[in-house]
Amino acid sequence: MSKKGRNKGEKPEALIVALQAANEDLRTKLTDIQIELHQEKSKVSKLEREKTQEAKRIRELEQRKHTVLVTELKAKLHEEKMKELQAVRENLIKQHEQEMSRTVKVRDGEIQRLKSALCALRDGSSDKVRTALTIEAREEARKLFDTERLKLLQEIADLKTAKKQVDEALSNMIQADKIKAGDLRSEHQSHQEAISKIKWESERDIRRLMDEIKAKDRIIFSLEKELETQTGYVQKLQLQKEALDEQLFLVKEAECNMSSPKREIPGRAGDGSEHCSSPDLRRNQKRIAELNATIRKLEDRNTLLGDERNELLKRVRETEKQCKPLLERNKCLAKRNDELMVSLQRMEEKLKAVTKENSEMREKITSHPPLKKLKSLNDLDQANEEQETEFLKLQVIEQQNIIDELTRDREKLIRRRKHRRSSKPIKRPVLDPFIGYDEDSMDSETSSMASFRTDRTPATPDDDLDESLAAEESELRFRQLTKEYQALQRAYALLQEQTGGIIDAEREAKAQEQLQAEVLRYKAKIEDLEATLAQKGQDSHWVEDKQLFIKRNQELLEKIEKQEAENHRLQQELQDARDQNELLEFRNLELEERERRSPPFNLQIHPFSDGVSALQIYCMKEGVKDVNIPDLIKQLDILGDNGNLRNEEQVAIIQASTVLSLAEKWIQQIEGAEAALHQKMMELESDMEQFCKIKGYLEEELDYRKQALDQAYMRIQELEATLYNALQQETVIKFGELLSEKQQEELRTAVEKLRRQMLRKSREYDCQILQERMELLQQAHQRIRDLEDKTDIQKRQIKDLEEKSNRKHG
């Protein structure tokens, strides 16, 4: 029996040596895995850099294509303008020739009359009369010539001064436009770079934090495995305790057998043998009582462990109950995403219908038969007014239909939201925090790109207040987006004009010279037209009608821009909702996997001091302070060496001492493992606190950067609006005097048409760019997920190999 006890003492030492060797192997494997992970991270960073470079290259190519398109459009517009000017020039030349022929006829009549008078004078008058008439005719001709020459010289001087002023104004405007365009470009590029940097940094931080959370989850999983092994050790200890109980029962029976013959002998006053044996019996009885007390304490500890196990099972059930609202929320978000998809499809269909109608209207306008020759200015004005009124009426009807449809869609969405809010039950559960999961962190991760309010759980107590605040915020955001969109359209139009001027400087210089020459030609015609209009008294009324039509057209354009901005905002919100739904699904899967693998647990561990027996500390905790376990083991050893006892009793006592020593060693190992686990849990909690602090700092920094960007955008919008207004005022002041109202309106309509075409093309181009970038981002995310799956598979393979090696060593 003593050999068996020694073998049992040697087995743990061999197990410890094997475990140490396995631990060293695992450490080496861990270092190799960490090196591989670092290499994979470097590869991922290289891939991201390459993707950013490719995106930059694609952006540059797109910008070049855009500039080429702009130059082509400018050339087309210039050609159209030249054609129109050529037609106007031909008409004016014809009118001038008609007027010249009329004046020639008048002069011919006067010459014939004078010739007849001269012939009459020549026939019936003398030389004196002839000379007097010739002198008078010469003087009159000289006076007329002088007056006409003075008038022409004065007109030439006025035209030269006007030309100089126009040249100076044009040069100043071109320089100012170039400077402002350069400033706007530089600011736009800097803002775009800052936005891309912020997005890249936020994505990098989110990925890093997710990797840290996954690593901590794996550590927790390994710790839970160690706990399972420790529970196995506890079960082994329970089995050993049962064996101890049996051995103690045998010891008690042996003591009863020893004490029974002594009781039968009657007591004598002077018996020395009874006096010698009584202290040994008392010692044995004390030791047996102490052993019984330790056994009871071990049983109590076993019951406590069972209670803790039951508590852990209750905690698992509670966590399962708490996961149910998250799943319900995910389902609600999926339904909402589907509804938004349906509404977006409807909006896209409506946009297509509107674009078709617009193209049909343009085709009708372009295919409209040419105007007949009008006999008077009144007919011309009436025809122009009728055409403009018809065009404006069509635009008004079209825009009114679009506005009605959009208001209906908006009312439908509002009704659906109200119905959802009224149908939602008010729940107020108390949610315990999960390890490695924070709902606010998920909301902060999705709020960098999302503007839609989906981060509110259905179980919050202040739903109505949050909904009112969200409605106010959405209205403010809508107004801000409309302002930003209008300002960007204006800035885009200005940039298009300025870039075209920079590219085709020589062509524009030639066109400018031609326009100035034509302006000088048209001035006389304009004065005649103004005189005729002043005579008829219709100039002010006509101008007022024109201004009213212009205002109405601007209002319609603003409505169109608002509707387009709302459509763009809805698309962005839908994309944000999709991204948030994907993130929530991914997080839900992670939580389900974590719940499946490792339920949460609560350890209350009191580490023991070095040099003190673990059983002694346990007895002191239970209130038994008289027992000294090292002394008890020594006494058992002494009893085992005592020769007065029988062999069976000695063997039982030796076995009890060995079992107690082994139990003490096992308990020390268990408590050491528990202390290490507790320390690891404390470290993980501290890491989680640091992670939460870092997350809060990052959120604050992101909010600050967003506010700075919003302020910068608002400032840019204000500057662009002031620049646009100033340019409009300058052009009206400087060129309004040179052209007639009709020509100004024609130029404005042509510019508006061109601007609409440019805006439509720019929107299509921006949509294409956004789609391509979203595809690139999705590909990058897919690549990252594949790499993470590969790393998980490698780690699982490594764990399987480690378990196999542990089994072999065991």
Curated annotation (Swiss-Prot):
The organism's place on the tree of life at top rank: Eukaryota
Xref: InterPro entries: JAKMIP, JAKMIP_C
Keyword Coiled coil annotated: yes
Coiled-coil ranges (or none): 13-102, 148-178, 207-244, 280-419, 468-597, 664-808
Short name of one Pfam family: JAKMIP_CC3
Sequence segments annotated as region (Disordered): 261-280, 437-465
Keyword Coiled coil part of the UniProt annotation: yes
Alphabetically ordered keywords of this record: Coiled coil, Golgi apparatus
Biased composition, class Basic and acidic residues, residue ranges: 261-274
Any single Gene Ontology cellular-component annotation: Golgi apparatus
UniProt GO molecular function: kinase binding; microtubule binding
Cellular localization per UniProt: Golgi apparatus
Family stated for the protein in its record: Belongs to the JAKMIP family.
Protein name: Janus kinase and microtubule-interacting protein 2
Organism: Homo sapiens
